Amino acid sequence: MSLDINQIALHQLIKRDEQNLELVLRDSLLEPTETVVEMVAELHRVYSAKNKAYGLFSEESELAQTLRLQRQGEEDFLAFSRAATGRLRDELAKYPFADGGFVLFCHYRYLAVEYLLVAVLSNLSSMRVNENLDINPTHYLDINHADIVARIDLTEWETNPESTRYLTFLKGRVGRKVADFFMDFLGASEGLNAKAQNRGLLQAVDDFTAEAQLDKAERQNVRQQVYSYCNEQLQAGEEIELESLSKELAGVSEVSFTEFAAEKGYELEESFPADRSTLRQLTKFAGSGGGLTINFDAMLLGERIFWDPATDTLTIKGTPPNLRDQLQRRTSGGN
């Protein structure tokens, strides 16, 4: 992985009671040792693989103002990180779920793009076996489950300030207003809505195949084509490119997909990030609620699975063997 750390700072927020978060600030930057580089590379990998929300700085963003000064050389990185940690503490203190943690600021370069990553990481306890085969307690940074993370694409921010996607952040777990306080800390507002773009793409694909008067099998083949392309982009860490997708769908209609999407006003960007959960709807039907979870291939609808919208009834012809076995054992037992 071609990742180079420019500067990295680490501070700590300690929760003493319900009202107070204590600041512990380093007096020097971290040295980019092999261990530190491995940690940042892992954080970069984990973060890049997660679904993110996109945003942009507001004109009043204090973080953006101080970051701009730091980039211009008017403030050093350590001072910037110390002041920002203080502001983060002030925002976190407003929320009862604030747990504290290690606050990381890392300015790094990956594949010719400069980033500033800000994360609050937790220390977890575990066990290890030492060289004498004794079991001892140990601690580790919980990178895989970090949900208070944001990343600024410094290259995009400085070369294309009108962009709505240079800032990304994790939404956090359901029920926690992680995004709320982090947006306040960053002084940012939500920008590109990747999920809405993906939903718009799905609608455009369905309408495109309908206008081309394709039969059911042909429509599903097109959906599979779209899913395969989008999934390949997702796995490669690349965005969905409408022009490239349109070339994949050449021959489906006399009108290209890009022309169709523009003419019908779907307001799709030329490129946008893939959203895994939304794209899955191209090939699957899935839903859960009220103790029921259903997931099946889209091609089965109308063949083995039938939906009656008038009665909201789903009829399944031919159950999976393992499910059938469970049903038979349960009913034969009189339960």
From Swiss-Prot:
Entry-linked InterPro entries: Nucleoid_associated_NdpA
NCBIfam families on file: PRK00378.1 (NF001557)
Gene Ontology annotations for the cellular component aspect, listed alphabetically: bacterial nucleoid; cytoplasm
Pfam families: NA37
Cytoplasm in keyword set: yes
Main location: cytoplasm
Compartments, as annotated in UniProt: Cytoplasm, Nucleoid
GO molecular function, one term: double-stranded DNA binding
Protein name: Nucleoid-associated protein YejK
Provenance organism: Escherichia coli O6:H1 (strain CFT073 / ATCC 700928 / UPEC)
Signal sequence range: none
Keywords: Cytoplasm
Domain of life: Bacteria
Disulfide pattern: none
Family assignment from sequence similarity: Belongs to the YejK family.
Keyword Cytoplasm applies: yes
